[in-house]
Amino acid sequence: ALLKEKKLPFGISCCYTSQNFASISSDEYFDQMVEWGASFVWYFHYMPIGNDAVPALLPTPEQREFMYHKIREARQNKPIFAMDFQNDGEFVGGCIAGGRRYFHINANGDCDPCVFIHYSNANIRDMNLLDVLRSPIFMAYHDGQAFNDNHLRPCPMLENPDKLREMVGKTGARSTDLQS
């Protein structure tokens, strides 16, 4: 309410699963976000990572296609900009991770190519940002883009795991998984 009151732009991040994809893409849900004052909504689909991952929550191809169309429909009909981390790959040329447009820094300062991919050779506490982006795993990401000619299947973990294994092996990146 405070951001809306002060007229500051803000967005909402949503994770859709095989169980909630219809409800969080409904007209009512979009209307609620607009009422709250959100300028944009950023959708991610569930990624089965971590010790307690539930692969059954990963959206099916049909559910991803449903979201593909619902988000484009919302862009045409709702006063909020909707983006989909996976399904908008065709607009951004595939995966945006690895420092191409985005990367993740965990609580220990490890710089991972993506919030979902916990491998690194760089820590922000030990090097500057430019050196992080020049680290072996980030350069492997740079050199490997696009990971798939089909930009709707851009992820080196989910849809192209052979590419991820190759990059980790080639660069000697270590696991930065804070759970295991």
Model-flagged regions — what are they?
Residues 1-94, 107-108, 112, 116, ...:
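Radical SAM enzyme [4Fe-4S]-AdoMet core and its adjacent flexible, acidic
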Residues 96-100:
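Short, small/polar residue-rich loop motifs at catalytic or cofactor-binding pockets
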